[in-house]
Amino acid sequence: MTNEEYIEKMVQITSGFSKEGYQVILASYCREEGDLDAAREIKNRSEQQKNITIFDYDGTNRKQLLEEMSCSIYIIAARFHGTILGLTAGKSVFPILYSDKTKYVLEDLGFHGEYADLRDPDSLSFENAKKNLESGYKIDVTESIQNAEKHFEKLDEFLNN
C-alpha cells in the first residue's frame, strides 16, 4: 500500500466516525516517521473537521497521552505502541498492522478481534474498522502484564548475581 493509499483509507475511516458523531483524535507518536504530517493531511482531507483534533506526542506529554487514551471509547492504532497502550488501558482496539511483530504479539495475547494489515489494503476500511467497537470486543491483558513483570524480576535476579 502506498502512502497516498494509506492516507486516503484513513481519511475515509476518520470521516466515517466523524459523520457518526464521534470525536476523533489523531495521535502523532513520532514526528520523525511523519506521523504529525500524516495526521494533518488526514484531518485536512476529512469531512466534518470540527470533530477531529490532533494530539502531538513529543516525549514530554506522556501523561496527557495516557489520559486521552483512557478517556477514549475506541482506539484505532497504526503504531505498535498505540495498540499495546490501548489494550493495557482496557479499551476496544482496532490494530493496523504494518509488520508481523504486532501480529505475533496479538496472537500471544489471545486477540481474536478484527484488525487491518497494510499488506492487504482491503482490510483497511471504515466497515472493518468499526467492527470491534460495535461488538464491544476487548481483551484482558492483566495476566500478560503480570507475567511480563515476573520475567523482569527473573532478569534482575540473574543480572544481580
What are these model-derived regions, one by one?
Residues 1-161:
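Active-site anion-handling motifs in enzyme catalytic cores
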